């Protein structure tokens, strides 16, 4: 392993904002991870494991070590009823989805073009167009930082929720995802009840769903390689049935979906209807085609993004009485932070 000192983080996160890390290293094996996390030499140094850096914003320079997960490899097994994949944590997620479609393996096509690595998928329980990671998860393997051993969790043990998992709670900063196990029924059924997939026929093919999802994302979502962004910036808020009924009276065209604990309201709709598409602070801007995305127009600072996010949050609350929660992870100088904490520090 080669450790970079004073590394520029711009190439390592999709917002593409200039920040530095005291140290940065690429891990290509579990032994690399063990050496970094479990040896006395590095024990006291703050560490952050990243994949593609596609769901994070570095709010300032990072004083610890950035560990880039580049564990690679895909193993495929099958029986009469199921395809099973064992995927290393550093595998590129969009490439994995594309590979599955090429192999005729259905189940991931709704999750096409979500930037990131396989190891990040269970942490966030990524989802799109009616499918979440938990729906295809068989197990997750992780390096336990307390024991230095690789452990396996079943899907149920991962405690998946909406953009949530055990890795954000009980195992936060105690685990590094090394691999995921995926399970796909050969009796594939398309999930086409959401958005632009609704007009696909029930007898459509895996490739049809994949192409539609890709076309939709490329039309509505900016390419991070061209315009820096971290995808959906805010979570879709879940509100009670009573609160939704009140909201519907004033806004009968509100976009929402049933959820386990109430109604999930489209955050993009809330931001759009608050008149914030194209709203800009410094080099940070609400994307004119997709209000849920904040983009770096080329010279944005982290403060620009944070100020814009806070402004969006306040305006949406003023309009609808709904507080948006950011989906993007905020990384401070040595640990994860959040918008409320950042705002209190500015006061």
Swiss-Prot record:
Q: Where in the cell is it found?
A: Cytoplasm
| Cofactor(s) annotated in UniProt | FAD
Keyword Oxidoreductase applies: yes
A single GO CC term, please?
cytosol
Classification via Pfam families: FAD_binding_4, MurB_C
Please indicate if the UniProt record lists NADP as a keyword.
yes
Gene Ontology molecular function terms on file: FAD binding; flavin adenine dinucleotide binding; UDP-N-acetylmuramate dehydrogenase activity
Q: Which pathway does the UniProt entry assign to this protein?
A: Cell wall biogenesis; peptidoglycan biosynthesis
Instruction: Output the superkingdom of the source species.
Output: Bacteria
Q: What is its EC number?
A: 1.3.1.98
Active site residues per record? 163, 232 (proton donor), 327
Swiss-Prot/TrEMBL keywords: Cell cycle, Cell division, Cell shape, Cell wall biogenesis/degradation, Cytoplasm, FAD, Flavoprotein, NADP, Oxidoreductase, Peptidoglycan synthesis
- Where do the FAD-binding PCMH-type domain residues begin and end? 17-187
Chain coiled-coil ranges: none
Q: Which GO terms describe its biological process?
A: cell division; cell wall organization; peptidoglycan biosynthetic process; regulation of cell shape
Reaction catalysis annotation:
UDP-N-acetyl-alpha-D-muramate + NADP(+) = UDP-N-acetyl-3-O-(1-carboxyvinyl)-alpha-D-glucosamine + NADPH + H(+)
- Where is the major localization of this protein? cytoplasm
- NCBIfam families per record: murB, PRK00046.1
Q: Family per UniProt?
A: Belongs to the MurB family.
What exactly does this protein do?
Cell wall formation.
**UniProt protein name:** UDP-N-acetylenolpyruvoylglucosamine reductase
| Record organism | Vibrio cholerae serotype O1 (strain ATCC 39315 / El Tor Inaba N16961)
Per the record, the gene is murB
């Amino acid at each position: 392993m080669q450790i970079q000192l004073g590394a520029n983080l711009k190439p390592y996160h999709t917002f593409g904002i200039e920040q530095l890390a005291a140290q940065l290293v690429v891990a290509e094996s579990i032994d690399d991870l063990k050496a970094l996390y479990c040896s006395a030499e590095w024990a006291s140094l703050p560490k952050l494991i990243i994949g593609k850096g596609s769901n994070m914003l570095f709010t300032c320079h990072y004083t610890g070590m950035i560990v880039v997960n580049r564990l690679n490899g895909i193993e495929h097994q099958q029986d009469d009823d199921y395809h099973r994949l064992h995927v290393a944590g550093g595998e590129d997620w969009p490439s994995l989805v594309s590979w599955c479609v090429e192999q005729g393996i259905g189940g991931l096509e709704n999750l096409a073009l979500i930037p990131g690595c396989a190891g990040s998928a269970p942490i966030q329980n990524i989802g799109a167009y009616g499918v979440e990671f938990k729906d295809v998860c068989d197990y997750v393997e992780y390096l336990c930082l307390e024991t230095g051993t690789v452990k396996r969790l079943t899907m149920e043990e991962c405690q998946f929720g909406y953009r949530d998992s055990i890795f954000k709670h009980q195992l936060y900063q105690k685990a590094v995802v090394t691999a995921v196990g995926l399970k796909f029924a050969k009796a594939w059924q398309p999930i086409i009840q959401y958005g632009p997939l609704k007009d696909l026929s029930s007898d459509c093919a895996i490739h049809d769903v994949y192409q539609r999802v890709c076309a939709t994302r490329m039309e509505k979502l900016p390419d991070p390689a061209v315009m820096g962004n971290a995808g959906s910036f805010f979570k879709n808020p879940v509100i009670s049935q009573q609160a939704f009924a009140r909201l519907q009276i004033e806004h009968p065209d509100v976009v929402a979906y049933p959820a386990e604990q109430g109604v999930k309201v489209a955050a993009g709709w809330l931001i759009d209807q608050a008149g914030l598409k194209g709203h800009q602070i410094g080099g940070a801007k609400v994307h004119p085609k997709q209000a849920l995305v904040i983009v770096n127009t080329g010279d944005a600072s982290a403060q620009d993004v944070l100020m814009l996010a806070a402004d969006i949050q306040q305006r949406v609350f003023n309009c609808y009485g709904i507080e948006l929660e950011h989906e993007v992870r905020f990384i401070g100088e040595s640990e994860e932070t959040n918008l409320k904490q950042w705002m209190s520090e500015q006061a």
